From Swiss-Prot:
Coiled coil: none annotated. GO terms for biological process: translation. It comes from Thermoanaerobacter pseudethanolicus (strain ATCC 33223 / 39E) (Clostridium thermohydrosulfuricum). Part of the 30S ribosomal subunit. Forms a loose heterodimer with protein S19. Forms two bridges to the 50S subunit in the 70S ribosome. This is Small ribosomal subunit protein uS13. The gene is rpsM.
């Protein structure tokens, strides 16, 4: 099993797909990396040579922010928004949608399960 950026890539998948298991790498970035490394995207991970794996590892380490570093950067960006108290930061703090979606109905993913309020008795 090839290990790149601290992630074990699945052996039976194509390299193009297997690279997407790394946080911060999607299909287009995966193809970009494979082109730079000169590796055929249709190759299975188990068929990669040690040299190809080391080339992929080197390219990813040098040129891309992935896994822990990327997660940390995203978390710091959100924390910065919350600290400066801007609108987006406040929405993050309150656990509400940040990008202008309606909240009168829907928005259940961000708000979590319903908290039912009892009706007033007469």
């Amino acid at each position: 099993m090839a290990r790149i950026a601290g992630v074990d890539l699945p052996r039976d998948k194509r390299v193009e797909i297997a690279l997407t298991y790394i946080y911060g790498i999607g299909r287009s970035r995966s193809n970009e990396i494979l082109a730079k490394a000169g590796v055929n995207p249709d190759t299975r991970v188990k068929d990669l040579t040690e040299e190809e794996v080391s080339r992929l590892r080197e390219i990813i380490d040098k040129e891309y922010k992935v896994e822990g570093d990327l997660r940390k950067e995203v978390a710091m960006n959100i924390k910065r928004l919350m600290d400066i108290g801007c609108y987006r930061g406040i929405r993050h703090k309150r656990g509400l949608p940040v990008r202008g979606q309606r909240t009168r109905t829907n928005a259940r993913t961000r708000k979590g399960p319903r908290k039912t309020v009892a009706k007033k008795k007469k």
